């Protein structure tokens, strides 16, 4: 709040130094809405949206390399329709659809578990994609990157979100 008058007997102290960065004003508003929508506490959503350790500044964005065209280019068509459901074989690792999402720009890729998220993040990095693995690489996400993680990764900062992929948490593996 701006120009707040303190209660009598309370003296405000000037803010001398800002120690780090945190969630954007938009994420703060979203946390309030989510708390109202699911009758939860705002603090739970703010924890999900905040870095685990202090972050002095967002990481500098790496220059974007072209994302290679994978063998499953059929996934590119799914993103032409806005919202789509794509069915794949149970043993599919999700890399094809993830690469298709990354060809659109920075993507949010949600997986069922952290092991699968790590595996997918490594595969995307090998393909030349700038990846932030949630929740550990909050500063990288804030600087602009594809975010890979479990459902809580949806609270990571994404300044240039271009596509979202949810890899079914009810997968057959």
Task: Please give the residue ranges for each predicted region.
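Accessory, non-ATPase domains that flank or precede helicase/AAA+ motor cores in DNA-metabolism machines
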Residues: 1-173
């Amino acid at each position: 709040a701006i120009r707040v008058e303190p209660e009598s007997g309370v003296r405000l102290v000037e803010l001398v130094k800002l120690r780090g960065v945190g969630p954007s004003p938009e994420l703060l508003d979203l946390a309030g809405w989510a708390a109202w929508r699911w009758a939860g506490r705002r603090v739970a959503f703010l924890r999900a949206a905040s870095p685990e350790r202090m972050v002095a500044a967002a990481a500098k964005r790496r220059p974007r390399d072209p994302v290679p065209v994978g063998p499953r280019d059929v996934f590119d068509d799914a993103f032409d329709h806005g919202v789509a459901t794509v069915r794949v074989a149970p043993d599919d690792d999700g890399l094809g659809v993830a690469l298709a999402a990354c060809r659109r720009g920075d993507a949010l890729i949600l997986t069922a578990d952290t092991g699968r998220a790590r595996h997918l993040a490594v595969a995307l990095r090998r393909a030349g994609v700038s990846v932030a693995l949630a929740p550990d690489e909050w500063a990288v996400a804030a600087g602009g990157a594809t975010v890979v993680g479990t459902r809580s990764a949806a609270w990571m900062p994404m300044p240039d979100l271009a596509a979202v992929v949810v890899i079914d948490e009810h997968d057959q593996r």
